[in-house]
Each structure stands twice: as structure tokens, then as C-alpha cells.
């Protein structure tokens, strides 16, 4: 994504006018997460965001995993319909790990590293596909969107260029999306958030000195930033800019 566009959003969301005093945030919930990574100049935020969501979901159960975004970036080279920019949606990540699997971060710390053929974990050997199935079952996650001009509570394709695999999303009202997202985060589930230009994992909830609520989001631009690489996005901005969120069916409230 274009960082300058997103930075303008952050100014609007978190600071407003530069002369205003910075907000003082109080964290209400801050879920467990793996170390913040840096996507560099790539446009692969969707990979980092959805992998971070899966990691937080497993940390909820005490199962620590740290996954390699570079493995998926390399596997995209085998996809004939993948854009040269390597852009995508979080749902794209779910499709790709189902097909190609996933490996740990320590096994592949660069896109230039050869992709491992096996994953070694707790004395066991897995293929990347077997390892992925142990982390994310097919159909475990669901995609949510909000388009007020289309029927609610029906599945439909998200009409975005980055949805090049033509994944389908459940269309729900924005009020419901905010309620579902807040409830999932407070229950310590991983949730992935996307707007038109960027994607991040939602890892917490906070309020400012005026009681205004924010989602705490784990970014993928490194830690040399305010709040150590976390971003505070107000519920109002979430309402205005959200394109989609992903969470497990359990987090949504389905059996």
C-alpha cells in the first residue's frame, strides 16, 4: 500500500490538527502477539496482517507460533493470476496457505531464502501443508464486509482489485461488524482488518482521555514508530474506512 495515504488516515484518526495535544490512551484489552515485523517497501501488508491474526488466535490457547510472510510472498510467484505488485486480501492469504502451506519465521527470514520443504516443530516433521492445517483448518475463518447498497446477511464477492481470487464475503451492517469485532477482541480472538490501502491485525481496545474508543492494531512497519509499531484507530474511523474483517467462525459466534 501507499504509506503516505495511510499516514494521512492516522493523522485524522489519532491526532487531528498538529497543534492539538496528543491523545493519552488507556488500554482496556491488549491481546498477546508475536514481535512486530517490517514489510519494508513491499505491498504485502495483507500477508503480515492475516498471519498476525492467526498467531494471536493461537496465542489465545497458549500455542506460540511465529510465521514467515516471505514464504507466502515466494509462493505467489507460482500463481499465474497474481499481480506483479503482490497485493492481495487477507482472504487471499487463507487460500494460499491452504494450497502451499506455511513455515515458521525462523525457517525463512527473507524472500531470497529457498523455501523449506519441511517444518520441524516440537520434535515432529511436517510438510508446509500439514503444518498449515494444524494452524488453520479449511473454512475456520470467515470474511465480513459492509456494503449498504447490497443485501445484508448474504455472501458475495468483494468488488476490489486486490481480490484476484474472487473470494466471497458475508455482507453485514457496519453496526454489527463493530459489535462483532469488539466482542471478538475482548474474548482475545485474532481479528484482521482491511481498508482500501492497508491491512493490520486488531490486538486490543483502548480509550482516550475523553472516553472515545479505539481499536489497537498491530502494524507491519517495524517498531521505530509511536507506540512501538501499534496504531490506535478510532471506532469512528473504523466505521468510515473498513473494507473487510476476518475472524474465526467461533469468534463471530457460529458453531
Spans of model-derived segments:
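Bacterial Sec signal peptide processing site at the extreme N-terminus
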Residues: 18-25
Amino acid at each position: 500500500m501507499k504509506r503516505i495515504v495511510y499516514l494521512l488516515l492516522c493523522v485524522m484518526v489519532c491526532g487531528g490538527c498538529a497543534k492539538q495535544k496528543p491523545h493519552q490512551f488507556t488500554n482496556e484489552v491488549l491481546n498477546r502477539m508475536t514481535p512486530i515485523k517490517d514489510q519494508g517497501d513491499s505491498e504485502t501488508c495483507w500477508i503480515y496482517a492475516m498471519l498476525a491474526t492467526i498467531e494471536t488466535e493461537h496465542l489465545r490457547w497458549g500455542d506460540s507460533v511465529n510465521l514467515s510472510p516471505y514464504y507466502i510472498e515466494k509462493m505467489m510467484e507460482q500463481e499465474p493470476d497474481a499481480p506483479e505488485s503482490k497485493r492481495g486480501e487477507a482472504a487471499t492469504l487463507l487460500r494460499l496457505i491452504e494450497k502451499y502451506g506455511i513455515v515458521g519465521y525462523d525457517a525463512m527470514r527473507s524472500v531470497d531464502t529457498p523455501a523449506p520443504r519441511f517444518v520441524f516443530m516440537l520434535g515432529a516433521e511436517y510438510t508446509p501443508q500439514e503444518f498449515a492445517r494444524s494452524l488453520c483448518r479449511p473454512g475456520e475463518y470467515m470474511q465480513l464486509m459492509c456494503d449498504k447498497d447490497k443485501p445484508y446477511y448474504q455472501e458475495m464477492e468483494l468488488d476490489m482489485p486486490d481480490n484476484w481470487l474472487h473470494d466471497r464475503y458475508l455482507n453485514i451492517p457496519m453496526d454489527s461488524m463493530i459489535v462483532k469485532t469488539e466482542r471478538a477482541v475482548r474474548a482475545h480472538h485474532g481479528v484482521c482488518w482491511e481498508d482500501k490501502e492497508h491491512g493490520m491485525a486488531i490486538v486490543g481496545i483502548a480509550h482516550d482521555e475523553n472516553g472515545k474508543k479505539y481499536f489497537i492494531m498491530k502494524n507491519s512497519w517495524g517498531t521505530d514508530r509511536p507506540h512501538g509499531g501499534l496504531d490506535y484507530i478510532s471506532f469512528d474511523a473504523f466505521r468510515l474506512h473498513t473494507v473487510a474483517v476476518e475472524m474465526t467462525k467461533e469468534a463471530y459466534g457460529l458453531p
